[in-house]
Amino acid sequence: TAGMLTGCGSDDKAKDKDAYRQYGINCIENGSYDDAVDAFQKALDQSVGSVGAEELDICYYKAKAQYLSGDVDGAIDTYTAIIDYNKDSDAYYLRGCIYFAKNDSDKGLKDFKTALSENDDNYELYLGVYETLSKYGMNDQGKEYLDNALKLKAKTADDYMQRGRIYTMLGDYDSAIKSLQKAIDEKLVKANYYMGEVYQKKGDNDSSQKYFKKYLDSGEVDSYELMNMGQAQMDNGNYDTAITYFQNALELESVPNKQQITKAMIIAYEYSGDFATAKSKMEEYMKDYPDDEDAAREYQFLETR
């Protein structure tokens, strides 16, 4: 793709920028993170000094690709450049997440606090901070952020949905259901997904599947949510249903977590007893992701079945 591109006039540069950006996104989805970084940099090179919403969007993608490629310091530098330009709360939050991954919790916490000071009524930001702190063993500190989020006043259907998510994380399922129902009553389709999660945690698989199906039928579902639905079915031993969710995810136009979904689907085939399909899918997987050592060992096992 890159070899076909030329940068002549400004219109050509705009087309090149869009093409490089899309190529970079495709590379991320295929696990080719170094190629993605190169593509995003080439996209930025077409901008000739101008910085707008599209350039910032490309910078976010570039930082993500850098992190996934193992260039943690490069990702930090890219987020820092965004922060220097416009103090964006998302950049502070994402840089904070990387600091935690580097075991630098002090810098991470500082970035989280700055992110929330820039955007203190963003429920998703509070949720993201909680999930990161919980991941790194700071669950109690994370819950303080959730408690602070619940002090905000819900104004929109999305606010009620986010509050439902928070109550779910705190284990207050009755309050979660009440908040999510308000969002559903206001026609926010995605709230059905989180309602399904609540009932899943309550052990009510029938109700969980009812809400998951409502969301699935809406056509708004993304690959991460479909993977979570599939994993929930795996946990309940419903491997054929799980495979259907994974297949639906892989058929979407954008599948940034393609590798994880494909791997989960292979395991589902294996658990269902369909070793022939599991082996066939694993052969395809190994061609696409030859560096996955765990998958190589799993393939050796499947060859013996």
Show the residue positions of the predicted features:
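Canonical tetratricopeptide repeat
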Residues: 22, 54-57, 61, 68, ...
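Register position in tetratricopeptide repeats
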Residues: 29-30, 68, 101-102, 135-136, ...
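Start-of-helix register in tetratricopeptide repeats
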Residues: 18, 52-57, 90, 124, ...
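C-terminal motif of bacterial Sec signal peptides marking the signal peptidase cleavage site
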Residues: 4-7
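Structural marker of alpha-solenoid helical repeat scaffolds
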Residues: 46, 50, 84-85, 118, ...
